[in-house]
Amino acid sequence: MKHTYPMVFIYNEDTRVYNGYIPDLTLYCEGETLENVYACAEELIQYYFELATRHDTEVPLPSTLEEITNKWTGYKVSLISADIK
């Protein structure tokens, strides 16, 4: 099953690293490229769901893209999906 969450992208000019933040799950990752951040985020979402299942923990529903975009004005916001087994 595929799960999709909004992710906020922040580019750090000092370190030249992209940061990705998934507010609904409180997950954070970074990478030298956007592709690295997407790959990292996908793995984190999969791991999050794996742990939530293992520990019988409720997973928050995703916010809408509009909600996150309005909250994180001035930042790039995109959707990230992960296949959960």
Model-derived features with residue positions:
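Short aromatic-glycine-(Arg/Gly/Cys) micro-motifs in beta-strand/loop hairpins
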Residues: F9-P23
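A short, exposed loop/beta-hairpin motif centered on an aromatic-Gly-Thr core
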Residues: L25-N36
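Structural detector for hydrophobic anchor residues on beta-strands
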Residues: Y5, Y18, L27-C29
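A ubiquitous short alpha-helical element
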Residues: V8-F9, E32
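Short, charged, surface-exposed hinge/linker loops at domain edges
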Residues: M1-P6, A39-K85
